[in-house]
C-alpha cells in the first residue's frame, strides 16, 4: 500500500483553475519530484499538501489514514496544527528568523508545540510544579534533538551563529533541521536549487540523497530537469494544472 496517496486534487483561485485533478502516490522512503515550468501549479500543489491552503476537491491519504477529504467538515484549529506537523515544508526563501540564532531557529517550532502539550497536561489537574517539571523535560528532549540534527547536517559549529553569518547552503540546512525537528512523515522542498550555482546545487543533491538514506520520504518541487533526475525515485510533470507525464526514475 502506498504511503501517500493523493486523489483528484482540484484548486481554483479567483477565476483560474490552478489544479485540475492531480492524482499520484508515493512509497515510504522515496523521493517524488514534481517538475514543471513557472505557473504550472507546482507551488499551489505543495501548499495544499502542507495545508497552507486547502483543495476544493479531492482526498489526501497518509500512512493508511485519510488526512483530508473535501467532502468532510472543515478542519478545526487543533486538527490543522496536527496536519502541519505531518508534512514539513522547506521554503524556497528559507524563512529563518534573523534575530534568532541557528539553535533557536531550529527549536522555536518545537517549543511552541511543547507549550501546547503543557496546556493539555495542565487540564489533567496537574500542579504548577508538575507542569514546570514536564516542560523542562520536553525542553531538554527538544534541545538534545536540535543538537543531534545540527550535527547530522554539518552545522554543530554554527549553533550560536545568526542567519546573516551563514552561506545560502547553510541557511537551507537550518531550514531543513527546523522542519525535521517536528518529525514530519513527509518533507517537502519548494524549489531548493532556485538561483543556486552548480557547486551549491551539487551540495543540495548530496544532502537530499543523505536524507533518503535515513528513510525520509520527500516531495521536491522544481523546474530544473537535470536536478530532478539526480534525486528522484519518481517524477511527475505538471503543465497547466494537470499531470502530463509520470514515471519512475
Please annotate each region the language model reported.
Residues 187-190:
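Catalytic Walker B motif of ABC-type/P-loop ATPase nucleotide-binding domains
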Residues 181-185:
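A short, proline-enriched helix->beta-strand linker immediately N-terminal to the Walker B motif
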Residues 50:
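Helix-to-loop junction immediately C-terminal to a conserved catalytic motif
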Residues 228-230:
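A short, surface-exposed alpha-helical micro-motif characterized by mixed small hydrophobic
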Residues 162-166, 170:
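Conserved ABC ATPase signature
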Residues 222-223:
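H-loop/switch region of ABC-family ATPase nucleotide-binding domains
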Residues 198-200:
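Helix N-cap at the start of a conserved alpha-helix in ABC-type nucleotide-binding domains
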Amino acid at each position: 500500500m502506498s504511503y501517500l496517496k493523493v486523489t483528484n486534487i482540484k484548486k481554483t483561485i479567483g477565476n483560474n483553475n490552478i489544479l485540475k485533478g492531480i492524482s499520484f502516490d508515493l512509497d515510504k522512503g522515496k523521493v517524488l519530484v514534481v517538475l514543471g515550468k513557472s505557473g504550472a501549479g507546482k507551488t499551489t500543489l505543495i501548499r495544499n499538501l502542507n495545508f497552507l491552503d486547502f483543495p476544493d476537491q479531492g482526498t489526501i491519504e497518509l500512512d493508511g489514514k485519510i488526512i483530508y477529504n473535501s467532502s468532510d467538515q472543515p478542519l478545526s484549529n487543533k486538527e490543522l496544527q496536527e496536519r502541519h506537523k505531518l508534512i514539513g515544508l522547506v521554503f524556497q526563501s528559507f524563512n529563518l528568523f534573523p534575530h534568532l540564532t541557528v539553535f533557536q531557529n531550529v527549536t522555536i517550532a518545537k517549543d511552541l508545540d511543547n507549550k501546547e502539550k503543557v496546556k493539555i497536561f495542565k487540564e489533567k489537574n496537574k500542579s504548577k510544579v508538575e507542569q514546570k517539571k514536564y516542560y523542562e523535560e520536553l525542553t531538554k528532549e527538544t534541545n538534545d534533538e536540535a543538537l543531534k540534527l545540527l550535527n547530522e547536517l554539518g552545522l554543530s559549529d554554527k549553533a550560536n551563529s545568526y542567519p546573516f553569518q551563514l552561506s545560502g547552503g547553510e541557511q537551507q540546512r537550518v531550514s531543513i533541521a527546523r522542519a525535521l525537528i517536528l518529525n514530519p512523515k513527509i518533507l517537502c522542498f519548494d524549489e531548493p536549487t532556485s538561483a543556486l550555482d552548480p557547486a551549491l546545487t551539487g551540495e543540495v543533491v548530496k544532502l537530499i540523497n543523505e536524507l533518503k538514506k535515513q528513510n525520509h520520504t520527500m516531495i521536491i518541487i522544481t523546474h530544473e530537469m537535470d536536478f530532478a533526475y539526480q534525486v528522484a525515485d519518481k517524477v511527475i510533470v505538471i503543465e497547466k494544472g494537470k499531470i502530463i507525464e509520470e514515471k519512475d526514475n
